[in-house]
Structures are given as structure tokens and as C-alpha cells.
Amino acid sequence: MADTWSIGAHTFTSRLLVGTGKYPDFTTMQRALVASGAEVVTVAVRRLELSKSGEASLLEWIPKGMKLLPNTAACFTAEEAIRTARLGRELEMGDLVKLEVIGDRRTLFPDVEGLVAAAKVLVKEGFTVLPYTNDDPVTAKKLEDAGCAAVMPLGAPIGSGLGIRNPYNLRIIMETVKVPVLVDAGVGTASDAAVAMELGAVAVLMNTAIAEARDPVLMAEAMRAGVEGGRKAYLAGRIPTKLHASASSPMTGLIGT
């Protein structure tokens, strides 16, 4: 039986979601997207060049069959984010939206007050909202109560590559909310993706870790394997941690005893 997961009316098999920014060129981006095995790709609505003559649109390079997840990147107020989400829908990018309301330009941490406010409006307008948020369980619960279809807490600041810095809060969020929890931002390498999945995340979203790797296509393959391995480890169940050793072989029936 396939190990699928769902957000709203959408069901997926791959638990890796990828972005489209920071690649050296469109060809590399396209090859990496294919190598990742991802079914969902996020695109910044405000950065789309849909009508620039003489130049191919970013959307033309996204492999056919991938689900578009428009995002409200670079929005610093709830009002900006709401307008941007509406623009994405006008461009026929669907009901899904990765909601970002940034509160600080240096850290790119979210403005959680504005985020919750924007989420409430967009949910009422029929959007399937996936909010990028901090790793605070209280905020995650407020977003769930606002009607968000999932919550996407950061593992570390966007593009930092620092990995999963606060696994304890992420676990509390997963225990607190009933909607899917996707780890978004901060992943640097495949082991970070595996850790996120081992904690119980439904999926992981990343961009910089693949796009700025020395070999983006190979890193996309590594991230795919990391997510799949972490998911299998979570389902299998790790052994309890212990302070002292526990012999693998029986201590009875030894030679000479």
C-alpha cells in the first residue's frame, strides 16, 4: 500500500517539496526537480516573469505533472501577502498557497501576528493555506485554529543550512496540532532532511540546500534518499536510547563456562 499524505483535497506520494530559486540556470533547475522525485514545487508569485518577451518563463521549465505551490515570499505585511495570494489564483495557479509574512529582513523570521491575520482571510476566501511559521507550538495551534490545512515550522532560518536546530519544539508542535506538519527552511544536507522525517514530519520543503549545492542534481537525489530513509526510520521505530551498553550477543553459554 502506498505511503501517501494529503493536504486539503490534494494527495501526494513524495514527501519532498522543492523550490525554484537560486539555481544557476533553468536547465539545472529542471534536472534537479526531476532528480528530486518531488511532486510539489513552490514558486514565488511576485517573481514570476510571465510576459517578458524574448525570454522563457520560469513555469515553462517546471516538469509537467508537478503541482504548483505559489508562495507569498517577500511580503512583509498581511495585506501584501493576501494580495499576492489572490494574484496567484488569478494566474490560475490553484487553491494552494504557501503563506509567508516576513517580520525581519535579516533573519527572515515570520511576523506571526500578521501571518495568523492573513491566514484567516485567505481561508475564508477558499484557499488551502500552508503557513511558513516559527517553531512555536502556540503559534502553530493558532494557525490550525484559523483553518490552515497544514503548518510549516522552520528548522532554521531560510537559506542558513543550519539544519534542525530545535527538534524538541518541532516534536511538541507535532503533538499539539492535528493538521500535517511540514518542516520548511534551514535544511543543509540529506541528514538534516532525514532528521526532520525521523521526528515525524509529514514532509520537508527545501530550496537553497539543493540549488546552491556544488552539484544540485546530485544533491536533489541525496535529499530524495534522505527523506525516504527518514520516513522509513520513523515508521520502523528507533530503539530507546540508553546510558549503558546492551550486548548484541547472549551472555550465556559462552565457551569455557
Swiss-Prot record:
It comes from the Bacteria. It holds the Pfam family ThiG. It catalyses: [ThiS sulfur-carrier protein]-C-terminal-Gly-aminoethanethioate + 2-iminoacetate + 1-deoxy-D-xylulose 5-phosphate = [ThiS sulfur-carrier protein]-C-terminal Gly-Gly + 2-[(2R,5Z)-2-carboxy-4-methylthiazol-5(2H)-ylidene]ethyl phosphate + 2 H2O + H(+). The keyword Nuclease does not apply. Pathway: Cofactor biosynthesis; thiamine diphosphate biosynthesis. Homotetramer. Forms heterodimers with either ThiH or ThiS. Its EC number is 2.8.1.10. Keywords: Cytoplasm, Schiff base, Thiamine biosynthesis, Transferase. It is found in: Cytoplasm. Belongs to the ThiG family. It is an enzyme of class 2 (transferase). This is Thiazole synthase. GO terms for molecular function: thiazole synthase activity. GO terms for biological process: thiamine diphosphate biosynthetic process. GO terms for cellular component: cytoplasm. Catalyzes the rearrangement of 1-deoxy-D-xylulose 5-phosphate (DXP) to produce the thiazole phosphate moiety of thiamine. Sulfur is provided by the thiocarboxylate moiety of the carrier protein ThiS. In vitro, sulfur can be provided by H(2)S. The active site is at K98 (schiff-base intermediate with dxp). Its main location: cytoplasm.
